[in-house]
Amino acid sequence: MKDSEKISHTRVDSKNYKNPLCCRKIIEISSRSNRSVKELKSLLTGRGIKRHGKTLVSGKKIVSELIRFNPDIILGWISSAGSVFLPSPVLLDIPCYKVTKELFRELDIHGTGYPLLVVKVPECVPYQENKISDNVILMIAFQDPLNVGAVIRSAAAFAVTSIVLLKEAASPFHPKSIRAAGTTVFAAKFMEGPSINEVRSIDRSIIALSPQGIDINSFSFPERFVLLPGVEGPGLPPGLHPDFMVSIPMEPNVESLNASVATSIVLYEWYRLKR
């Protein structure tokens, strides 16, 4: 047994669920130095997510959807001391981490107050352009997990399924990214790509965004292309020369759009024109 960790089994009140009474494993944790706590807290970082192959999911809507549609990826759930309850009978045989209120608040970074899920992160396959049949590839180098999540959601909405995560990109399974993307992040298939400095394309045009680019309203999208928004702030590296640069018209008193918003507009315009 790990330090400061108490394992017990409790019975579920049949008044709450129609299924028979069942034992449930509860792991009670009170110490901040506990190894389980350290691992759970590391899942709030991209490095910890990659190391352990797990992440944390919060929010009643997302938690409920995962329980309903993706129960196989759920490894555990976390509840605050004094308020342990089952969000669903699906979790009856899945371990529950019962932590102190203070620790729960640290893990529940969005302040939902609802039980958290510990879920398995899908593996990313290496990027190989010649094995992708889709005409459009989205390459993400965003370093803000909120932007990563937002653009993944937009990609799903506009039928872009080939998503390459460049080395600069934040984890799409960071809790902030999941919050922005919703459950679409668990349906997406990601590929691990090179650094943005090394991006090349075999048979697709590379399209980037720039205020000095072609007005998107008059731009004709090639049949096959790579959309490469760049990194927030710096944009594209000096050595990268895209085939096309497109711009989004806006009021002159606005300096620029958020990176994920601008990318979403381009994806929508392509989607609208191809329909």
What are the language-model segments listed below?
Residues K2-G82, A169-A170:
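Boundary-proximal intrinsically disordered activation/regulatory segments immediately upstream
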Residues E28-S30, C96-T100, A188-I196:
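Short acidic-hydrophobic, aromatic-tinged amphipathic segments that line or gate anion-handling sites
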Residues G59, Q143-V151, L257-A262:
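Amphipathic alpha-helical repeat scaffolds
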Residues G82-S88, P172-H174:
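Short, charged/polar "capping" segments at the starts of alpha-helices
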Residues C96-V118:
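Glycine/small-residue-rich loop that forms an oxyanion/phosphate-binding "nest" at active or ligand-binding sites
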Residues P115-V119, A156-F158, A169-F186, P238-R275:
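Structured adenosyl-cofactor binding patch, chiefly the S-adenosyl-L-methionine
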Residues P122-G213:
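RNA substrate-binding interface of SAM-dependent RNA methyltransferases
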Residues A208-V254:
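Active-site/ligand-binding-proximal alpha/beta "capping" segment
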